[in-house]
Amino acid sequence: MKPRILSYGEIIFDLVGGKPFLGGAALNFAWVVNQLGGEATLISAVGNDDFGLEALSIIENYGINGHINFSGHPTGTAIVDSDGKFDIAHPAAWNQIEIPDLEDGAYDLLYMGTLAQMSSFNRERLANLLQSLTVVVFLDLNLRPPFYSKEIIFDSLRMANIVKVNVEEWQEIKKLTVIEDPFGFMDYFNLSHLAITRGYEGASFFFDGQELQYRPRKITEIDPTGAGDAFSAGLAMGILSNIPAIDILKLGCDAGAAVAGIRGAHMKLPYSVRAQLIL
């Protein structure tokens, strides 16, 4: 049976050089999950505008299941600079994500970040959802200043089983928690897995008192947008599929590297990546 995954969070059009590319961490994650043989269901919101209608059409064409409501705010947008930094328009539709009633036991994992939790509207509904489901929670912090707080970070970590951060976010987390050791951090928040990504240098993977490192082959980076989300999708699918830990890490790194080598977050993954996970 395919891993069944809920992907909760924002839909955003990334404006790169003035050209719009459909993205948002939750959508990017779902797109890669489906390519790796999973069955993703996206929970998000768009505005009743041209971008919103375009997003719904594209998502339908992608074959991604969705619970996507229309919000009173415009569809999310973000200006992305050459370093991959985001200037996110706010407020936006992703501030008001309605969550339908979902059957407990119907899903294996829920993916979430911190950006969509900036609104109390979303935090309340997400907390209620997690109380109603027995599911593995994958937290990809995706810290986007100024759209996070210590309270949101700590609450999210307490809900999580698996956490992925990049190396800059890890430095921020160490300051907030005053915990330097990854295993001490995992013990404090009762995590089963922790991944720290380091861009072209690969990533570290912590689990069961063990640490693994992997560095993918060097690529020519075109656009880092969505690479971290692809890594998370590979990691989640690898964990749910019970493949060896080093293969989980390799899958995540190779998926992220493939996406970083093209412009925009939605590429068809090369067979060399997809073939690592034959379900």
Description of each model-found segment:
Residues 4-6, 108-109, 162, 193:
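Structural motif
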Residues 1-64:
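Glycine-rich phosphate/adenosyl-contacting loop at the front of the ribokinase-like
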Residues 1-4, 178-279:
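Conserved phosphate-binding/catalytic region of the ribokinase-like
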Residues 39-40, 66, 137, 194, ...:
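Hydrophobic anchor at the start of a short beta-strand
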Residues 39-114, 276-279:
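Conserved N-terminal subdomain of the carbohydrate kinase-like
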Residues 10-11, 25, 115, 141, ...:
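Active-site metal-binding loops of divalent metal-dependent hydrolases
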